[in-house]
Amino acid sequence: MHIIKPVWLTHGGERKDFEVYSCDVSPDGSRLVTAAGDGYVRIWSTEAICNTNDPAVASKPKQLASMSNHSGTIHTVRFSPNGKYLASGADDKIVCIYTLDTNPPSHATTFGSNEAPPVENWRTVRRLIGHDNDVQDLGWSYDSSILVSVGLDSKVVVWSGHTFEKLKTISIHQSHVKGITFDPANKYFATASDDRTVRIFRFTSPAPNSTAHDQMNNFVLEQTISAPFANSPLTAYFRRCSWSPDGMHIAAANAVNGPVSSVAIINRGSWDGDINLIGHEAPVEVCAFSPRLYASQPVDKQAMDNQHGAQNLVTVIACAGGDKSLSIWITSNPRPIVVAQELAAKSLSDLAWSPDGKCLYATALDGTILAVRFEDGDLGYATAMEENEKSLTKFGTNRKGAGITETPDGLLLEEKSKAGEIKGVEGRMGALMGDDQADNITNEKPALLPSNAPTPARPSSPAPDAQKSQPNGTATPSAPEPEKPDPYQAKLERLKQRPTYTKDGKKRIAPLLVSGAGAAESSLPQARLMASVSNQVKADTPQSIVDLSKPFDGLPKGGLATLLFGNKRKLAQLEEDDDGHVEKRVALASQNGATPLLTNTPDGLLPARPQPAPTGQQPTPEFIRPAVTNPCMAMSQVRLAVPKVRNQILRAIDPNGKPTEPPSASGESSKSRVDVVFEARNPSAASLTGRAVDREPVRLTLFRGEQPLWQDFLPRTVLLVTGNQSMWAAACEDGSVYIWTPAGRRLVSALVLEAQPVILECNGPWILCISAVGMCYVWNVKHLSSPHPPVSLQPALDAAIHTLGAHPSAAPAITNARINSEGRIVVAMSNGEGYSYSPSMFTWQRISEPWWAVGSQYWNTTEAPVGNLQTADAQKDKDAKAAVSAGIIPFLERNTTSETLLRGRAYFLQRLIKVLLSREGYESFESSVSIAHLENRLAAALSLGAKEEFRLYLSMYAKRIGAEGLKMKVEELLKGLIGGLFEEDEAGTAQRLQENEQEDRNWRESSETLCGWPREVLLKEVILALGKHRDLQRVTVPYAKLLGVVDGESDVGDAMET
């Protein structure tokens, strides 16, 4: 080891040398740059420094250039890793960007100075203004895509490494920020501050033409580390930290271990600092890892390849600070291998390694600039950079810089992509401020709204006194002529704020909250799982539309209970009841109002004797008795809770045919909203003859107001009723289902099921019935058909993990079971999972689950709850096809959020994922899960035919895989979108489609539409979203040419508004 300190290597002044605050080495190792208090940035030849005694080098120039573009002391200077730029920051609050001009310098030495004439022509290309105080440190990402500056104004400013536009200002530190370092895997950067914290920020490298809007949700805080710096002194001039070349550790300066100054080694992933380097007598102000990995023996590349990296490689770190000493550590040794003291008269301010790891440069506040040259074996034996890349591959590293557009078409596509994004931003801002109201009124083209965007809801008006009566028992309300609304009045209504009053009587203004899919514009959104705590004030925003039947006969709190039985269960053996448990249980049930049907006697089961009638006035019971269990349930592997027999069952619809609360349940105020009420009244008295078969019939009546429209009788007890403007249905205790036309004519003979019905829903002509053994039936009363055979709920109840059990086990409860306008069954469970049955594949599909809620960055838990959704009236929508399956995916995901938070699973799942992220092999876990979540959403929207959701999720997916640079997925997506658009249909539609398969619900179809959208429109949107990524232009430009995107002007606004 040699310490070299040339006399000429200084920022000289008239009386003394100026303080040198920073130094750095160029990526090719040929230049050393220094910054000092004289306001100069000086570039030196490293060859001249390290070979001072060599006569052959003495004649070569030592100082290559000097720049004086700052008006004060320069605190930091850094080369970009691609070697193209040089950045400096000073106390004039400015960051200057220099670049090397190939032309020789045009000016000689400044008049009146002793400066040597410049050898290289470094010119200033940009002056970056963004700080309010001194700039203390700078850092470049390893792909040179961003530059980050920190300063005494507590700000962290992110600049584009291509255009040097300010991308984001992060004001999260509470005091001066004095250090920054970047992760070599290009995933994080860390900042150190006088608020005694080191903060880790996660980022995705922005594209060359990215704007501040693009990066709104990029550069997010990952972790705050404060324990190692709890009592660290605030007198240090710098807190320059460093990231190890293998990406595993951060060396943080100015840490403390008890009363002793130390360097904290922070582990990646867990972000804990349990290792400390102790030995310096004053605060350590700068740490620097060598850029190479070292081996204990001379490195043979072929031997390393044969060992597949089995040889243990170590890292080397240099530390310096206020005690004017330099220490060098190796990770395999608990003590420093080199300690050099009194290297300068004042504190050492900065350290910089040469790219080959053989030379270390140091600067000090007394003006000292020195070099420490190591011989082979002093630190170990440096390995090739390929070993660094191998160690970083487990983090999913992406260190390549931005490519260069290869053709003018690629540049034109990039410009159109950016122009479309700007237009989309302007459109969203106009909608936010209410400026688009007039345009929406006069424009004939329907606005393209995402599924969770606020949709205007039609106001409900009271039914008129005189309505035209139809033979089907429903009324057709008179439709007034639509008046042209005042656009200015509509704008005022949109911006109106509702006043509310607190408990103490103070007036408060509840602002309108705008929620939409615009937050997913960035390629790296934030995921938050939080509970809603404010639902006292009803939202002023219109409710979202969901294409599902509205449950009129609500399920019990917590959902419909279910039981699963395994294949190995044993039937219970009948034994003598010595203690009389059965009699006690029967007596207790009789006290609660239950009526016995059978009596267990020595002669066997006999009909129970009628009970004496109670005397006096008795209240009307809410239910009469439990339903009789069907014998087939004894052998079924699935059992659902059966509703009790109620005295009165009501179903009410409003004049628009939508379900509503019956008058008896909602009071007098709701009578004006009720048009027709369907009532089933079960007999509450015992049989007059004493025989169960002689009980009174059930009376079914359809009312309009107080007037009955028709009446019918059934000999069997009714459990559930449903209906709408198209039909009425009742499900009985013996498993039979009866269906009437609106006029009261029986449409079909009784439909007999294998067990009692527990859920009965309808939507248009479709009826959904679920029996007590978990069988789901769907009927179309218009065509008297079914889209598929009866299907069991057993797969959706996690039955696969209970099939071999010997005892019954509780399964997830059913919290929602509905049907959409196409007859698709949608089921939500109490464990947070949501399912839909696919008639074309004859299987259940899991649409939503808690895994996405805690693992995906695209999960949104801050939107409106499930209760704010209203059912869609597809018959009255102008575009009925656009309303198919609308809102089903957000509905199921919101149910997942509420159930996950309610049962506390979110906490444990988040802890699990946090542990996984710190383990080796799971570094790309969050990104992979987020992309998989988008793919699941996309597949669900396509299967359900949810038109608006499909377009929204397709745009989000294209932007994410483009930002991640997943070329194979991009190419596959474009091939799937183009389908057979430009191919001749030789096989014909009949051969393409299978039975029960929709024409535009398949990627591989040659139809011109996909999920209701023209394939050409979707393909153009995806190409424009991917066009700004230069590394993908070899894939996207041919498709852009095929569609004519780059041939002429085209409307790209709609493509980016989603």
Swiss-Prot record:
Start and stop residues of the WD repeats: 15-54, 69-108, 130-169, 172-211, 233-276, 279-339, 343-384
Region (Disordered): 427-488, 590-618, 652-672
Location in the cell: Nucleus
Assigned keywords, A-Z: Chromatin regulator, Nucleus, Repeat, Repressor, Transcription, Transcription regulation, WD repeat
A molecular function GO annotation: nucleosome binding
PROSITE patterns: WD_REPEATS_2, WD_REPEATS_REGION
Domain of life: Eukaryota
One Pfam family cited in the UniProt record for this chain: Hira
Database matches in SUPFAM superfamilies: WD40 repeat-like
Protein family membership: Belongs to the WD repeat HIR1 family.
Alphabetical list of PANTHER family matching this protein: MEMBER OF THE HIR1 FAMILY OF WD-REPEAT PROTEINS, PROTEIN HIRA
Its job: Required for replication-independent chromatin assembly and for the periodic repression of histone gene transcription during the cell cycle.
Protein's name according to its UniProt entry: Protein HIR1
Organism: Aspergillus oryzae (strain ATCC 42149 / RIB 40)
Gene designation per UniProt: HIR1
